[in-house]
Amino acid sequence: MGRGAKRLLGIGLLAVVCASGFYLWSHFVYADKEVERLTAEDGTRLKFRTEGEVIQIYEDGAWQPLFVQGVNLGATVPGHFPGEFPIARDDYMRWFAQIKEMGANVIRVYTRHQPVFYSSLVEFNNKHADDPLYFIQGIWSPEEQLIEKRDAYDEEITAAFLAEIEKDVKAVYGDLEEPESPGKSSGSYRTNAGQYLLAWSIGTEWDPEMVANTNELHADKKAFAGEYFAASEGATAFEAWLARMLDRAAATEIAYGWQHPMTFTNWVTTDVLSHPEEPLFTEDMVSVDATHVRPVDWNAGYFASYHAYPYYPDFFRVGDKDGRTDTYAAYLRRLKAYHKDIPLMVTEYGVPSSAGVSHEGPLGRSQGGHNEAEQGEIDADMTKMIRGEGYAGAILFMWQDEWFKKTWNTMPMELPEDRRAYWLNVLTNEKQFGLLGMYPGLEDKLRIDGDGRDWDELDETEKTELAASVPGVESIYAAHDEAYVYLSIRLDRDFDPDKETLHIGADTLPGGNRHGKELPGVTLNEGLETLVTIGKDDETGVRIAANYDMEKRLYGFVYGMIDMSEAELADDSGLFNEWRLPLSLKMEPPDTKTAHPYENVVVGGLRRGTNSPASPAFDSLAMWQYEGGFIELRVPWILLGIADPSSLQAVSYEMPDKAFKTETIAGIRFVPWIVDKQTNAVSGLNAEEAGGRPYDLSQAPLYAWDGWETVAYTERLKTGYFMMQNAYREIGGKPKTGG
């Protein structure tokens, strides 16, 4: 054997030794950092169990009652979709520390994460052995197939779910090799995180039509008796199927010498209560009852869990006749009363800090329309409310903002759908539930506060001067990031909204308004799609040309739920409508139990204030401010008709197949002018010398930008983080009753 061959052999042996050492280290990494646990006579280990109506933790040689307080943790960051699993060790380690500092004792994950999640959690807990951070492992059901086939007993669905259950249990115990598969986690799971597990959570929110159809198709399958879990008397076919899934999870885990509490996911739509006020049949058509499943030989126990938000379904609002009833507290009380002698946990609740709204909730607990302070106050109040009603735990939705998310009233305009993760639509509330904000690229560089010094400090490549031939306007600059277009306007005098109004028209496509009351005595040779108006606080906002109005076109022209006049349909109507989003669609029998009107909300208003967290007047929804003669604002992309700024797509006037489409644009042509409120005289648009001729819009500067495939974002703990921290400290991990 030559010297080179010997050298290679030596390197190979060293690699094997190192690999073996890593394997042993990862499997027995906590050998000297073991959590206190109870070991039964048969050697089975328990750290958590259910007892009566509470969760208990084994500490100081005894079982102690524990209120489970924590957050749901997503699987992605901006610029990525969940199936890409982009979160790195450093991200997890940073987040775990922040979550622990907040006072949470648990995190919940919906699905199996990449191996780095489990190795990072074990590494973190080794540094906090006296008070580790526990986790609840969710096991994702074949959601799309369940909805499509509407039959849980379908052989492919059942086989896929059973296989996923086994894989997830093995992953937690560091015993899984999973090959790469699009949209799914994969890799070598070699870190045993089992001792930090608090519970297993099986499944996702169940489609009611699937549940009802499963029960109807398999009425003869109401019984299931497994070794560890069984269906109780009165169970439905779907509940028996769930008992089988729980039994498989238990059977897989017991092989690793551990038992942990079990639950399955449920939500208000398939709860056990009757809601006669609910207008939609599907929101109150079938129940999935946790009390119809029981542990047979599972000492760790079993509990019920629900996703419960204060604004959905509609009965929360419809049942609030006087606008003062706390329908959420009443619901929690009724749900708790039903679940006797079993712990009950809310595993999702919360409100987002978003400009957009998609459901209105009683007492201001709507799905959106809150700044970060309001979000935190509501989240903290609900946390204490859940605990006060005797629940075993409350797990907030959620830890981090998720840009890839969508919601029903903005998704028709977010096109292409597969690029949602590359920009932040602040009108899509689902994107901003987090306590950890994920902010666009200029968040820390441009503060809306009326101080232009941060504009001066911007690199020349980050801003563009827009030549403005408007008397009294010294300069206009534009900038952008993944969420907003920013504009700064410097006047040669102090801005006085009592005496003047500043308008900035935006042209992106052929068509739109070439005249209007906002253009007194002036016409344009090309139309405006949207109009930004800056004046008094109640005047400032973005409006949209009537024939471009997306709400009117979709819910008026296509669906006929609201009126769209002939005048609004015409090109160059001269009408600029309020920018609105629907909150509730028009519903009538026999499609619904009761008639329900179409409802909407104005989202085009721009709130004056400062978005600087350092300011006592901090308002995360502040969109504009002025000081003296300096005005600055930020405008959400969608309010300008931009469907995807990362690929320069604007919502088109055309609606083939009665749905929105997009057109690629060169940029946005901004057209500024000032109107004197006393004389109605126009400054700008060459009004003084036009002589009745239309203003040539091509004279206006075009703000152009390059598309992008990667995003720049910054993290910051929201105000709500600190409010939740106070709530957790007040609760102290102790349930209302000790069980």
Predicted regions, residues:
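Active-site-adjacent substrate/metal-binding segments within catalytic domains
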Residues: 32-126
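Aromatic-lined substrate-binding rim segments of carbohydrate-active enzymes
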Residues: 88-166, 245-258, 263
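Active-site groove signature of glycoside hydrolases
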Residues: 141-147, 151-154, 164-235, 257-268
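Glycoside hydrolase catalytic-domain groove-lining segments
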Residues: 262, 275-362
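Aromatic-rich peripheral "rim/lid" segments of glycoside hydrolase catalytic domains that contact
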Residues: 357-364, 369, 374, 385-463, ...
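Short, well-ordered beta-strand segments enriched in hydrophobic/aromatic residues
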Residues: 450, 484-492, 629-637
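Surface-exposed, glycine/proline- and aromatic-rich loop segments on solvent-exposed faces
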Residues: 465-587, 647, 651-678
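Acidic/polar low-complexity flexible segments
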Residues: 508-531, 641-739
